[in-house]
Amino acid sequence: MKQSDLQRLVERVSLQFFKKPFKHTATFNPRLRTTGGRYILQTHNIELNKKYYEAFGEEELIAIIKHELCHYHLHLEGKGYRHRDQDFRDLLRQVQAPRYCRPLPQQAQQRTKKVYVYVCSKCSLKYRRKKRVNTDKYVCGQCGGKLMLDNGGEI
């Protein structure tokens, strides 16, 4: 999908679901990584993540466009355009737009992080940490015993 196709799609969705024209620019932003799209308050433009179109197709892209158009139209009307505002939530429900977009497949893989488990050699108390701990510097907070890395640190 080209930029011109995207612009026409956003204009069509705006007229179809909101009965109002979209008079600004919609573009794909390759720098977006964790969000489906964003509405720029200063310029009134909408930026969308092309990875969502490639991963889930046009249906998911239209859902993201509807969400961003809710921000757009409410902001131009001077109403509550933020996620926490009741005007925004009501309009989302009215046009059946999602509040959040689905996570991309590669995002789900990135969340599985290593967990380090340290065990006290005296009282056997377990400590779970995301980062490695210098066992020469730190001791058990309960009894002062030496900490040992358990099972190579993975769970």
Curated annotation (Swiss-Prot):
Pfam families referenced in this protein's UniProt entry, alphabetically: SprT-like, Zn_ribbon_SprT
Gene Ontology biological process terms from the UniProt entry: response to stress
Predominant cellular place of this UniProt entry's protein: cytoplasm
Superkingdom, natural source: Bacteria
Active site per the UniProt annotation: 68
Localization of this protein: Cytoplasm
Domain SprT-like: 6-148
Family matches, as InterPro entries: SprT-like_domain (IPR006640), SprT_Zn_ribbon (IPR035240), Uncharacterised_SprT-like (IPR023524)
Keywords, sorted A to Z: Cytoplasm, Metal-binding, Zinc
Any single GO CC term annotated in Swiss-Prot or TrEMBL for this entry: cytoplasm
Alphabetical list of SMART domains matching this protein: SprT
Family membership: Belongs to the SprT family.
Protein known as: Protein SprT-like
